Regions:
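Non-ligating segments of multi-cofactor redox enzymes
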Residues: 337-731, 736-763
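Predominantly flavin-linked oxidoreductase catalytic cores and closely associated redox partners
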Residues: 171-176, 182-270, 335, 343
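Glycine/serine-rich phosphate-binding loop and adjoining beta1-alpha1 elements at the start
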Residues: 12-66, 171-177, 182-211
Length: 763
């Protein structure tokens, strides 16, 4: 039972994984192994120019260290593993910085580019940033590019050992590395791993795949003429190979799904034309079972029953993507992203023991089941809480992610379990003492919660401004984060905690309102200046002044719908304090947001919360006239306060920030987000919405947009099809991060950006 529950929890926590996971990297691309850096394709650089930039940046960081250079002539300052764009540029930059560097390459120099089809044009995107480092990069045929790079290596006397792959890596006690290759053994102070992942083609692992005429890349399509060719795969590489091979051959495509869901629009058009002209035959819902001499066995799903076909096959191209070399990386000691280790139940037991110790510390322990718990001294509670909490910390630093989950829960259970219920109603084990303990310097715990909230948003907001705005020179993101921080400081901190009281004291709101107890005594209602119903759930009851009722109706049912017409759900990413904490404090974990169809199905929950909020609000408004509604209304308010206001908006989502990204509340439980979604979807279907994200035809399927979407949208699938992304088909909140991270400038708000025509000229 416990194992089954843990598997279920594990599947939820792993739902943010992309098809290809990356190594878990700290700042400056350093892995969890000190002194071991990862750059290039493995580190998320989707195009050559960005991989080159990573190579230069990591060397700038290493060279600035006081121990960057070794006094021992037998120890290299740096060994670069991989001689592609990132690795070569890093080695050249290291040499320029006076570092003694060696580059190892298991294949040929620039092996990934070397394996491109002959004559393939290599682009120097993005155009907006110049190439960094010594490597030459401009639009060119792959043969010309490799020739220029080989010339640069020779001119700079760069020590590159081709056909010499890395076999083992061991960190020594003195901090250096012992590097074992296919041919020799070396020592180095630091390692830069730039092996990429495209050199590891994914395989079917079926009989006959090792035959001479079964390939995992297409190098020279002109070598094949008037032959039967089977292409396996449904991505753009497979379709492009099939199209070029179909010019002089009979081509069949075997694909496991029922349709091609991620094709470039132009590839889709060309494929349909080729199928209509009977130059290509499609075999959907099929899997290759075996490759034989001159034929292949394919199993086809015919809607419930399996049928085996034997198709002629002089050559087969298995083009189903590349595999991340996970086992190789783990053999080096590198930890992967979102890798769950440790014991869930051990972490849960230690978290409970910590709370139990705090129960004894609070002095409110009561006897239970005949056990004299009330007699346990407070200092024993201190020892128990310190020991259990310390064990969680120690386990966390040893790589136990469940321990970090336990610590995160303890922190936010304490904050919200004390603040939200209020004095005397705190959650166990803080009942009767927690609120007072957190009320400092004459201010209640609620005030210090607001201080903590604003501080977290400010500190991490400044980091986010640098990451997305300043470093990328992106004015949209700079203004977005300035907006979030401004709303938090002004409307969610200064006004409710200071300015409202001053407005009453100095009668800035007029003498009548200042002397109205219903207005003056409810400073908490000032949150409703920006928070609309149903996010500000109590807008219309508990005896509000008329001005609050009027403003609540105007904000919720006039201003918000008009705002949504032009901006979709940007309220979540530009204004809201809940979304603000997610966009700032939660930003560093945005790539862990749940993805896939299952995670989208979970989005029904905020509709349920919206319906419940509407039902309770209606009952509260009618209870004075309908006696039967009084008890259900009271129960509904209490239930909403407990489950929505404390657990769903507070404890659970913030606990899960480091594990499921920052938008758990906004995406799955926020009733206002769902209300805006319904408005925006209706506007889109009516054809009057002004909110959408468009795509041009330059998408390279790097998946950076999908990876960084905090609400788990498969943005790349929209970009590939050049399909507008709006709220009729997605829960997009308009943060624009997908637009910012795209290396090809594919995405934009509104109409697609104009394309610059690039002509391939040959010397």
């Amino acid at each position: 039972m416990l194992r089954k529950l843990q598997r279920k929890i594990d599947s939820v926590l792993a739902s943010g994984d992309m098809p290809t996971r990356r190594p878990a990297l700290r700042g400056n691309n350093e892995s969890n192994v000190p002194g071991l850096y990862v750059i290039g394709d493995l580190a998320g650089a989707p195009v050559i120019k960005l991989a080159m930039a990573q190579g230069v940046a990591v060397i700038d960081h290493i060279a600035a260290k006081p121990d960057a250079r070794s006094a021992d002539p037998n120890v290299y300052d740096l060994i670069v593993v991989g001689a592609g764009a990132a690795g070569l540029n890093a080695a050249l930059a290291a040499q320029d910085k006076g570092l003694r560097a060696l580059a190892l390459e298991k294949g040929k120099i620039a092996n990934t580019i070397e394996n491109f089809p002959e004559g393939k044009w290599v682009y120097a995107e993005p155009d907006s940033s110049p190439p960094k480092g010594k490597l030459w990069l401009d639009g060119a045929r792959k043969e010309d590019l490799i020739g220029r790079w080989s010339q640069i290596i020779t001119e700079n006397h760069l020590d590159v050992r081709a056909e010499e792959g890395l076999k083992a890596l061991e960190r020594q006690k003195d901090g250096t590395f012992r590097v074992t290759s296919d041919k020799a053994e070396y020592r180095a102070r630091r390692i830069v791993l730039a092996t990429g992942q495209r050199g590891n083609p994914r395989k079917l692992r079926v009989p006959g795949e090792d035959r001479e005429r079964v390939y995992h890349r297409l190098y020279s399509p002109r070598h094949y003429k008037n032959e039967d060719i089977l292409v396996v795969g449904g991505g753009n590489s497979a379709i492009e190979a099939a199209l070029v091979l179909a010019e002089r051959n009979r081509v069949r495509i075997s694909y496991r799904a029922s349709e091609f869901s991620r094709l470039f629009k132009d590839n889709d058009r060309k494929l349909n034309e080729a199928v209509a002209q009977k130059r290509i035959e499609l075999i959907f819902n099929s899997n290759v079972c075996e490759f034989r001499e001159k034929e292949a066995v394919v199993e086809v799903d015919r809607g419930g029953h399996q049928e085996r076909l034997t198709v002629p096959c002089d050559h087969a191209f298995v083009l189903i993507g590349a595999e991340l070399p996970v086992q190789f990386l783990k053999s080096l000691g590198i930890r992967m992203e979102n890798e769950w280790t440790g014991s869930l139940w051990r972490a849960a037991a230690l978290a409970f023991a910590t709370l139990l110790g705090l129960w004894f510390l609070g002095g409110h322990a009561a006897n239970w089941a005949g056990l004299p718990l009330a007699e346990v001294p407070r200092f024993a509670g201190v020892l128990l809480a310190a020991a259990a909490g310390g064990a969680l910390v120690a386990l966390g630093f040893r790589g136990d992610r469940y321990a970090w989950l336990g610590l995160s829960f303890l922190a936010w259970y304490t904050v919200y379990g004390v603040k939200s219920p209020g004095a005397g109603a705190e959650f166990w084990p803080y009942r009767g003492w927690g609120f007072q303990a957190l009320s400092l310097f004459g201010r209640p715990a609620t005030f210090w919660y607001t201080v903590l909230y604003t501080t977290l948003m400010t500190v991490f907001g400044i980091q986010a401004i640098k990451r997305w705005g300043l470093d990328r020179r992106d004015k949209f993101q700079i203004w977005r984060y300035i907006s979030l921080l401004s709303f938090q400081w002004i409307f969610f901190f200064l006004i409710p905690e200071f300015l409202f009281q001053w407005a009453i004291k100095y009668q800035w709101v007029g003498e009548r309102l200042a002397n109205d107890p219903a207005f003056a005594g409810q400073a908490w209602r000032s949150y409703g200046l920006v928070y609309a119903w149903p996010l500000f759930f109590y807008a219309f009851f508990y005896d509000p002044a008329k001005i609050w009722v009027l403003w609540g109706v105007l904000l919720s049912f006039v201003i918000i719908p008009l705002f949504v017409l032009f901006h979709g759900k940007r309220y979540c990413s530009w204004i809201c304090g809940c979304g603000g904490l997610a966009e700032t404090f939660g930003d560093r974990w945005r790539h862990l947001a749940p993805k896939g169809r299952a995670s989208m199905r979970w989005e029904w929950m905020n509709l349920a919360v919206l319906i419940f909020a509407a039902a309770v609000t209606l009952a509260m408004l009618l209870r004075d006239g309908v006696a039967l509604l009084r008890q259900p209304a009271a129960w509904g308010v209490n239930a909403y306060h407990l489950y929505a206001d404390i657990w769903l908006v507070g404890i659970l989502p913030v606990t899960l920030y480091p594990f499921l990204g920052g938008k758990v509340w906004c995406r799955y439980w926020c009733p206002l987000a769902k209300l805006m979604h319904l408005f925006s979807a209706a506007y889109t279907k009516l054809g009057i919405s002004r909110f959408r994200i468009e795509a041009n035809d330059k998408c390279i399927a790097c998946s950076e947009c999908t990876r960084n979407c905090q609400v788990g949208i498969d943005v790349m699938s929209y970009a590939l099809k050049q399909q507008p992304l709006d709220n009729a088909t997605s829960s997009c909140i308009g943060c624009g991060i997908c637009v910012s991270v795209c290396p090809m400038d594919v995405l934009s708000f509104g109409p697609p950006p104009k394309l610059v025509q690039i002509s391939a000229t040959r010397n």
